[in-house]
């Protein structure tokens, strides 16, 4: 990515989208992988991204940002730091050392499980769940269920990218979860 200013003004969402690389046929044929590493590598684009989330949540009276394993662990702690909040990791099964709750969810072929520490938050705590991308919505839905089992109020789900054709954002909204995504891509 160049440090040169764009020739035409871009809004923040277009600027962010311009820093996401599409890798065709990865990890398997037919998949268009949306790679956020160029976005993370450039300090300016990372700052613009975090500032978008900070502006959205600065007055939301939150207690925590919860990040989904693994790319939610990249932006979640930065956002929590900027908002002076705690960070809750929601991990893949078998990664958390203390007493935990688990929630399974369906994948295209099979299922997966995420876990949260049983003392991650208290009833009534206000939480935003964050990840890099919403595809089928399964991971974010499982995270929402876990937080609600602990009594948290899940204020919103947030992601950099929405892939609306995969149905995840609709599934999450239909469940009552408000969503904020910075940008979206058509296709897989």
From Swiss-Prot:
Protein name according to UniProt: Adenine phosphoribosyltransferase
Subcellular location: Cytoplasm
One GO cellular component term noted in the UniProt record for this chain: cytoplasm
Protein's gene: apt
Keyword S-adenosyl-L-methionine: no
Origin superkingdom: Bacteria
EC main group: transferase
Signal peptide positions (record): none
């Amino acid at each position: 990515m160049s440090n040169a200013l764009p020739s035409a003004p871009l809004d923040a969402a277009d600027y962010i989208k311009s820093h996401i690389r599409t890798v065709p046929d990865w990890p398997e044929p037919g998949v268009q992988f949306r790679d956020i590493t160029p976005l993370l590598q450039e300090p300016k684009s990372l700052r613009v991204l975090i500032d978008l989330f900070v502006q959205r949540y600065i007055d939301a009276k939150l207690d925590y940002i919860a990040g989904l394993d693994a790319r939610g662990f990249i932006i979640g702690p930065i956002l929590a730091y900027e908002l002076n909040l705690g960070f809750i990791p929601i991990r893949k099964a078998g990664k958390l050392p203390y007493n935990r709750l688990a929630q399974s969810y369906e994948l295209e072929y099979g299922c997966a499980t995420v876990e949260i520490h049983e003392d991650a938050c208290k009833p009534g705590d206000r939480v935003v769940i964050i990840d890099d991308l919403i595809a089928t919505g399964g991971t974010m839905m499982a995270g929402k269920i876990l937080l609600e089992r602990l009594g948290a109020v899940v204020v919103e789900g947030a992601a950099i990218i929405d892939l609306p054709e995969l149905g995840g954002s609709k599934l999450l909204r239909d469940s009552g979860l408000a969503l904020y995504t910075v940008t979206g891509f058509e296709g897989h």
